[in-house]
Amino acid sequence: MPKVEIYTWRFCPFCIRAKQLLDRKGVTYTEYVIDGDEDARDAMVARGSDGKRSVPQIFIDGAHVGGCDDLYALERQGRLDPLLAVAS
């Protein structure tokens, strides 16, 4: 079963929007709230595939999905549900 992880800041509107999509789909995820924690942000960047320091950053089964726009793009393309099917 894939593990869904999301790195966020508490009041980030893009983080809230990404979590809303996952919540609507009934996905259980691990959230890492990294407000102001540069060590945690560096760890997030090291895991990612594109070096982005922005939040949110989303991982499904260890694979870097990207940010909020990337998550919604997968949804529009019909590619998100297959990724989440075994995670739900």
Report each predicted region and the residues it spans:
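Local sequence-structure signature of Cys/Sec-based thiol-disulfide redox active-site neighborhoods
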Residues: 1-31
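Non-catalytic, surface beta->alpha helical segment in thiol-disulfide oxidoreductase systems
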Residues: 60-87
